[in-house]
Amino acid sequence: MLDVNFFDELRIGLATAEDIRQWSYGEVKKPETINYRTLKPEKDGLFCEKIFGPTRDWECYCGKYKRVPFKGIICERCGVEVTRAKVRRERMGHIELAAPVTHIWYFKGVPSRLGYLLDLAPKDLEKIIYFAAYVITSVDEEMRHNELSTLEAEMAVERKAVEDQRDGELEARAQKLEADLAELEAEGAKADARRKVRDGGEREMRQIRDRAQRELDRLEDIWSTFTKLAPKQLIVDENLYRELVDRYGEYFTGAMGAESIQKLIENFDIDAEAESLRDVIRNGKGQKKLRALKRLKVVAAFQQSGNSPMGMVLDAVPVIPPELRPMVQLDGGRFATSDLNDLYRRVINRNNRLKRLIDLGAPEIIVNNEKRMLQESVDALFDNGRRGRPVTGPGNRPLKSLSDLLKGKQGRFRQNLLGKRVDYSGRSVIVVGPQLKLHQCGLPKLMALELFKPFVMKRLVDLNHAQNIKSAKRMVERQRPQVWDVLEEVIAEHPVLLNRAPTLHRLGIQAFEPMLVEGKAIQLHPLVCEAFNADFDGDQMAVHLPLSAEAQAEARILMLSSNNILSPASGRPLAMPRLDMVTGLYYLTTEVPGDTGEYQPASGDHPETGVYSSPAEAIMAADRGVLSVRAKIKVRLTQLRPPVEIEAELFGHSGWQPGDAWMAETTLGRVMFNELLPLGYPFVNKQMHKKVQAAIINDLAERYPMIVVAQTVDKLKDAGFYWATRSGVTVSMADVLVPPRKKEILDHYEERADKVEKQFQRGALNHDERNEALVEIWKEATDEVGQALREHYPDDNPIITIVDSGATGNFTQTRTLAGMKGLVTNPKGEFIPRPVKSSFREGLTVLEYFINTHGARKGLADTALRTADSGYLTRRLVDVSQDVIVREHDCQTERGIVVELAERAPDGTLIRDPYIETSAYARTLGTDAVDEAGNVIVERGQDLGDPEIDALLAAGITQVKVRSVLTCATSTGVCATCYGRSMATGKLVDIGEAVGIVAAQSIGEPGTQLTMRTFHQGGVGEDITGGLPRVQELFEARVPRGKAPIADVTGRVRLEDGERFYKITIVPDDGGEEVVYDKISKRQRLRVFKHEDGSERVLSDGDHVEVGQQLMEGSADPHEVLRVQGPREVQIHLVREVQEVYRAQGVSIHDKHIEVIVRQMLRRVTIIDSGSTEFLPGSLIDRAEFEAENRRVVAEGGEPAAGRPVLMGITKASLATDSWLSAASFQETTRVLTDAAINCRSDKLNGLKENVIIGKLIPAGTGINRYRNIAVQPTEEARAAAYTIPSYEDQYYSPDFGAATGAAVPLDDYGYSDYR
């Protein structure tokens, strides 16, 4: 049987009226929903049981048949099938419309698909559909041509008749006038009386002429309209149309409303139209060609997909199942209903009224009005508010239509398909659990009991504590004593997942082994707080339970916290000692001169003191109080490895072995610290600042297995907390010391500030200069107070200990507390020239407090905005990169990128590249790295870790070629070798790893730390965008603010300095055409760069520039970089620019993550010439598809298509993805679905999102095909065992089982007695 959940692709298309009737289980004829008295559905109404199925399981409407035995019977009284009530979730109905209507998506979308197909302007289309104009649907050209002369003669006769009548009337009137005048003259009337009569007569004659002329014009209009009549012609004048129908009705047909559109589509020849459009594209120019291209996209979509365009005009409307638009009774007898029911009711009401009017033979104008209203009600049902005012419900709220159910964050896609609520989960407040191991978490007993309830119940039955599941459930609910023992047993080895929202990167969900704890709070290991970004001020976390064996295995192996020590963004450890732990280890390893029991060399008759034969002896002395752990001593060590240089000196080539003794001059604290490190790690004899601790853990992560690192950080945590407690570091008011010299320092600077103020008042300085001078003065003052403060504080001051150890805070904060706050900024980011002279210890004056709050509030507002922006950036990044999955081991490409390892200084020494951590580190080498003598230092295909990089630098190699995602040749996704080491595991990335999502999270997660503001460089200069807006600008491939021109060619610069503008001309070296950059604003300033002679200075006249070099300050436009230097350069440019923003904030992200995103931005090619391929010019095609199609066409002897690479922003690239499901769930849902339906798009379900939406395993990690399709191959022993079955005749078993089938392995002993 076919499994409905097992399919390889999902196609979307246009439904015709036939399809809609096929899906339907019956026609909904009445607008009624349910009977308010019986609360049962009305027959033929929107909830009808006959159509949609029974409301109660196995029970018909009238109650004749009840219960399962009657399954499948259709009741002859009420017509309801006896079946499960859940069919009401899947059975559809339909409404037969009395007049066709158009589908608003296809008529109103931008661009209007109906308009493009029929070549009608959307305005005209609207007039036709909403009964404001008639359209000619067909003209019998032949008949009109044959009878044209007869008709013309008839028309001539008619005109002649009108003219004759006019002439007759004029003549009669003229005669009457003559007679009247003669009569007046005879009476001897006055002249003005005669003039009045004459004027009146002439006026009447003029009216006769005008009337006749109007009639002649009308006839002329009718005739000319008729002779030029063509299909798709609009006639807005109703009288004109009526005349045409009366006179020439047999020569043409016309109509208004959706019926006319339906007729036009029926008569539309898609193939002929496509051919004529292709012809226009080949030979046309300008606007005409562009319009033809756009129309061809729509026409070709119908031509290729085999969709019938008739689907855009509906004769029947589907009614979705009633359970999806429920109606529920509230307390108080009122009903709450889905908006869809109201929208359907309007459609049915109007449809029934229209049917009645047609049956009654109502006048056309009334029928047309009703048809228009029907069209509007169907529009509102499909997409309310798309045209005109939206239909509103009670309280003027727009009703939610079918489109609104899909759109947006609350729509079906994002609310229910991409994120679901799950059972077996709970949440609670977190507290710190310092006694836990790294892989453990404390789970409250009550919560654990509820989570593991089914497991506990089953185990109770197994152990005979309970007779059946029901009594077991009762035991659990009453919390009997046996339950707790069973719970302990059940949770052992069963990991749980902990998650803290917001989950910004993959470490936001980790697996732990639960330990039962009293209380109601979850206990969290202190070292994982960094990864979760958790603190204990009331944060909550959610617990989830992996149920299946596979889920548990994945949680344990892949997600256990002790396996996730490294950051996926930088590959460096995240589980580091922090805060108290740092302080404790810093205290432990500090050396205090003159402390108790310090080593004293022998002098005179005093022997040397403070020398110990072993750490144990030293600890004994410390316990007796004669030695301080921080005093310098000499101690003989046998179990700790000496530092590298001492080891080389003492033990030579053979090296130190455990048990070899050596003397160390150190402190007991440092010996104790080193005993925490793994055996064989060289002795570290220095004070443990946070940076040193980080370096050690980094080194451990590079050289030791993860489990050793996890154990070590756990030991460091325990020691850190222990010694932090022992150190007694606390902060009180008495520790905040105000420097005594502060007043005199400030007085001195006050004088300088007064001088500047006076100069300003005299007019010697302008406002800006005065501000700059004051800012400079007060900056110096603040620094000097800080200096005085540092000198005044003793080294053992707790505040200084906390800051110096790197636990938290920095010296600026100490200065603010005890020295002076200094200058503060206003919301624009400019310094206010009055400093805050008080410290927080002394207290601020009212004015100081006020100006201080100014910038602080801006900071808070910024943070709120930044969080939302950063989340949206992450969402777009995930969307664009979600289908980048490692698909194969090696794509065998020879290409790669060159990265710098070091720079040669003028004296020949190597200066290590500061960005080596994010560029060369953790890459796969693309070619052998060879030194000057030709020795291979590191072979091709090796992973560059810290040891390899050190070896390369030692050999004097300054740059290497490494494999990169940018040059990977895998068609979908990337290969493992090009991606290199997985930052999170420290090993080569596994096939199936979703590196795209990891990349998006690594870039998005620190997004909140990036500043919002665009910072001002130098006074009035152009704003240079920085921080988050700059990252968005780069990833969206926008033209940057303050765009800087780049050199199109290599050549000499000619610089013309105008009044407000520069004009730069480049004279190319190859003698080509000169390139001129005109009107470059002087506010932008010329670029400073290295010249041929090695000096760094501003660009000036006569300088030599290379192609692609930036000429002005600011940012280059990536599209120009692509045009001038090609795709490879623009990729490197984007990676470099994004990294600059993150580095400015001190965030370390590996280049490879940014490369993954940039690769997606440059995935497409725009077709310039289609050659012999099916591609349309101007369309965007995936590069892999483009190359494959070209290879195919060339092999068949055709012309390949020509295309050029195009850089797309991440939003555009996400919407251009091949998967319509993924695009629709991202943004612009209705537009994506409209397009996909017309093209009859098929979703191959390659990415992650699409599979999440339809509820399949995602094709990443263990869900990838190569891991799912596994057959068990028997071992040789099993095969041999298979042959030991007593053999019958040969024909039963073929002698060879072959590799394909696998041998039959007996599972239990056969009893053969029956056969004998």
Swiss-Prot record:
One Gene Ontology molecular-function label: zinc ion binding
Cross-referenced CDD domains: RNAP_beta'_C (cd02655), RNAP_beta'_N (cd01609)
Binding residues for Zn(2+) 2: C891, C968, C975, C978
Binding site for Zn(2+) 1: C60, C62, C75, C78
Cofactor binding annotation: Binds 1 Mg(2+) ion per subunit. Binds 2 Zn(2+) ions per subunit.
SUPFAM superfamilies per record: beta and beta-prime subunits of DNA dependent RNA-polymerase
EC number annotated for this UniProt entry: 2.7.7.6
Cofactor requirements of the protein: Mg(2+); Zn(2+)
Enzyme class: transferase
Catalytic reaction(s) noted: RNA(n) + a ribonucleoside 5'-triphosphate = RNA(n+1) + diphosphate
Alphabetically ordered keywords of this record: DNA-directed RNA polymerase, Magnesium, Metal-binding, Nucleotidyltransferase, Transcription, Transferase, Zinc
GO CC list: DNA-directed RNA polymerase complex
Residues annotated as binding Mg(2+): D535, D537, D539
InterPro entries given in the database record: DNA-dir_RpoC_beta_prime, DNA-dir_RpoC_beta_prime_bact, RNA_pol_asu, RNA_pol_N, RNA_pol_Rpb1_1, RNA_pol_Rpb1_3, RNA_pol_Rpb1_3_sf, RNA_pol_Rpb1_4
GO-annotated biological processes: DNA-templated transcription
Function per UniProt: DNA-dependent RNA polymerase catalyzes the transcription of DNA into RNA using the four ribonucleoside triphosphates as substrates.
Family: Belongs to the RNA polymerase beta' chain family.
Complex and partners: The RNAP catalytic core consists of 2 alpha, 1 beta, 1 beta' and 1 omega subunit. When a sigma factor is associated with the core the holoenzyme is formed, which can initiate transcription.
Protein name: DNA-directed RNA polymerase subunit beta'
Source organism (scientific name): Mycobacterium bovis (strain BCG / Pasteur 1173P2)
Gene encoding the protein: rpoC
